């Protein structure tokens, strides 16, 4: 494998805290990874496994030698055990409505074992080890009712209470006598990043967030989009050919000629949650604006260069028809009403097919009873077949879908992955991936999936699908044989693939921690999963 375009600091997301070991030889870096909300009119969370990480680094080495991905909530504080290779990780946050959710983890970085001293605990703001090896933590009250009976009590958001771990105690008792005001100021993440870079001997950490999309421009050139630019162009040896900056950030790369980048415009100061869309074309090495659309869109492209844009109608001010069909010149636009669209229910993402495709509910203003539809060049909508058998159960409602076009000896078809809806909380994730013929919806093969799909590509007789729990699936496109289904690691550290692009027997992958790697498809076929998954390095 040829891995390249790594951030200078590897294996980290957005840094939220930096904690140096008292001996000065190790640093723990707490970071957060983004959910798959890209572009803003597409969202998928099902089965997502990696949100927060504590990575350990040695001086002078920008790659982590160990990482803990067990945290389910933001990491607020860390403490090193005085004698053992163990770290106490305190985390939590306000749930936005009433509760202060928290967790406390003791992680052994040598063995990888994690222990939660408390089954239930409110948000842990600070923690430290006592001399006897127990953990002392300062936590928020359980909820906002803390100060309801006492007008003189400080607000729950300003209060910390002291608890200590003890054998057999699953839920700590909060003693009001230990209450103290939280006078700490929020940590300066930028300052922490600068101190970390200095400690590692790096001019800059080079973090850029997730790689949202990839595309091959030719056999020797790869394009990528992430939060720090509109588009990057790389040579296959990893050399940066060009970085295209401008208003906003790149979200999707549409495989047309010329290449089109769907970008998200900068936030409007008057409406900070507004995310309008812009289209840029790459011509003669320059990225130029060709179109702006009011609202949150997703776009897909046909083989002949037509684009279909679907606008999220979650905004009550934009419930009217906002879908748009663009010809190959991107100059002529036809306004369409394909029915209701929301970010969890109607994204499909099929590119490079002779036709354009969309999902439509039954009736069209619904998110239920979804059908795959062909959108013709004149704007006519042809309903093809239901995504799932309409048996009246909640599981027949498909969500968080992703698709790809395929045309081989079996004929034209589509591969679609998605999630079976469940109306109850806490059920195990149930997902699917199948191949169906385009004409009649005949199912060729099907597999259960562990999480929602982030990306799917078809190449060299293979279907390659990446999932939000970090799994990569290789499926024989014709027979449906499952050749590989394994979690992915790079250099021993777990990751999640958000972007895939294949060309000339090579697969480019983009990760949620900002890395891009190349692997030969022939090599990928031969990999066998170990207990820790497959390592692309």
Residue ranges and their predicted role:
Residues 2-9, 63-68, 113-118, 198-205, ...:
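A short beta-strand motif characteristic of beta-propeller blades
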Residues 7-43, 49, 205-222:
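Beta-strand-rich domains and repeat architectures in extracellular enzymes and scaffolds
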Residues 13-19, 72-79, 120-128, 209-213, ...:
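Repeated scaffold domains used in trafficking and secretory/extracellular systems
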Residues 27, 87, 135-136, 222, ...:
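Hydrophobic beta-strand positions that form the internal "hydrophobic ladder"
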Residues 32-34, 92-94, 141-142, 228, ...:
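Residue-level signature of beta-propeller blades and closely related beta-rich strand-turn architectures
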Residues 36-51, 95-102, 145-157, 269-275, ...:
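Short, solvent-exposed loop/turn segments at conserved positions within beta-propeller repeat blades
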Residues 58-61, 108-112, 165-166, 235-239, ...:
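Short loop/turn segments that connect beta-strands within beta-propeller blades
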Residues 149-166, 494-537:
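Blade-level signature of beta-propeller repeat domains, shared across WD40, Kelch, NHL, RCC1
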């Amino acid at each position: 494998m040829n891995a390249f375009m790594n951030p200078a600091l590897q294996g980290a997301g957005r840094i939220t805290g930096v904690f140096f070991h008292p001996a000065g030889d190790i640093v723990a870096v707490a970071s957060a990874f983004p959910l798959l909300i890209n572009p803003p009119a597409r969202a998928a969370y099902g089965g997502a496994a990696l949100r927060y990480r504590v990575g350990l680094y040695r001086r002078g080495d920008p790659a982590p030698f160990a990482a803990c991905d067990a945290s389910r909530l933001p990491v607020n504080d860390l403490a090193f055990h005085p004698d053992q290779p163990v770290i106490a990780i305190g985390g939590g946050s306000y749930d936005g409505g009433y509760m202060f959710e928290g967790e406390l983890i003791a992680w052994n970085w040598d063995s990888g074992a994690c222990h939660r001293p408390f089954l239930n605990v409110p948000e842990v703001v600070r923690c430290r080890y006592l001399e006897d090896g127990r953990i002392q933590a300062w936590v928020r009250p359980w909820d906002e009712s803390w100060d309801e009976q006492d007008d003189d009590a400080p607000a729950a958001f300003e209060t910390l209470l002291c608890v200590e771990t003890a054998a057999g105690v699953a839920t700590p008792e909060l003693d009001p006598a230990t209450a103290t005001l939280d006078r700490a100021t929020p940590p300066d993440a930028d300052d922490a990043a600068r101190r970390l870079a200095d400690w590692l001997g790096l001019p800059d950490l080079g973090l850029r967030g997730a790689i949202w999309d990839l595309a091959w421009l030719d056999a020797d050139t790869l394009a990528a989009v992430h939060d720090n630019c509109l588009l990057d162009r790389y040579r296959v040896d990893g050399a940066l050919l060009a970085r295209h900056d401008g208003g906003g950030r790149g979200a999707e790369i549409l495989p047309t000629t010329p290449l089109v980048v769907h970008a998200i415009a900068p936030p409007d100061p008057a409406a900070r949650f507004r995310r309008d869309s812009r289209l840029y074309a790459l011509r003669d090495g320059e990225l130029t604006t060709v179109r702006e659309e009011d609202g949150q869109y997703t776009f897909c492209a046909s083989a002949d260069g037509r684009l279909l844009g679907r606008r999220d109608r979650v905004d009550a001010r934009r419930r009217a028809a906002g879908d748009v069909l663009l010809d190959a010149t991107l100059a002529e636009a036809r306004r369409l009403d394909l029915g209701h669209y929301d970010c969890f229910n109607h994204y499909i993402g099929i590119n490079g097919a002779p036709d354009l495709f969309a999902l439509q509910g039954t009736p069209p203003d619904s998110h239920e009873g979804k059908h795959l539809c062909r959108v013709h060049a004149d704007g006519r909508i042809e309903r093809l077949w239901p995504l799932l058998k309409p048996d009246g159960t909640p599981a027949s409602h498909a969500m968080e879908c992703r698709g790809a076009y395929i045309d081989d000896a079996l004929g034209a078809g589509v591969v679609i992955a998605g999630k079976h809806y469940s109306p109850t909380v806490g059920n195990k994730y149930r997902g699917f991936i199948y191949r169906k013929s385009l004409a009649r919806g005949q199912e060729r093969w099907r597999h259960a999936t562990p999480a929602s799909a982030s990306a799917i590509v078809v190449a060299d007789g293979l279907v390659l699908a990446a999932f939000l729990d970090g799994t990569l699936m290789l499926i024989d496109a014709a027979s449906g044989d499952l050749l590989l289904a394994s979690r992915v690691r790079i250099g021993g550290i777990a990751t999640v693939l958000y972007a895939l692009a294949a060309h000339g027997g090579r697969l480019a992958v983009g990760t949620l921690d900002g890395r891009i790697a190349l692997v030969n498809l022939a090599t990928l076929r031969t990999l066998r999963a170990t207990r820790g998954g497959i390592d692309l390095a």
